[in-house]
A protein has these predicted regions:
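Conserved functional hotspot residues or short segments at active or partner-binding sites
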Residues: 91-102
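Conserved acidic, small-residue-rich alpha-beta core segments centered on
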Residues: 1-91
Length: 102
């Protein structure tokens, strides 16, 4: 699961056609925030902007939706298997064979 700056980068690259995204939808927590210390020592965290991709998609509350959804399974984790990596490598192999996006 990813969020914040990783969503901004991934969503931005996906929106301009420079990345294919595999896995699960990200957290949808992509607002840049500031941390202000209050007089009593507490810290107030507040958003000061929004992130919108090149195609106009707002990531906050939505997340980056993968081009290829790969379910996350506990048994794969316990077995040391990474189905997301397998899917990405399979796509790369297909691209190399055909020289076009599968």
């Amino acid at each position: 699961m990813s969020g914040s700056a990783s969503e901004c980068f991934t969503g931005g690259m996906q929106s301009i056609g420079r990345a294919r995204v595999f896995g699960q939808t990200s957290m949808g927590q992509a607002l840049p925030a500031l941390f202000d210390r209050l007089p009593n020592g507490d810290v107030l965290i507040h958003a000061y902007g929004d992130f919108v991709t090149a195609d106009g998609t707002r990531l906050e509350g939505r997340g980056v939706i993968p081009d290829q959804i790969v379910p996350f399974r506990r048994e794969d984790l316990l077995a040391g298997r990474d189905r997301t990596m397998e899917a990405a490598l399979g796509w790369i192999d297909e691209f190399r064979r055909t020289k076009k996006t599968p």
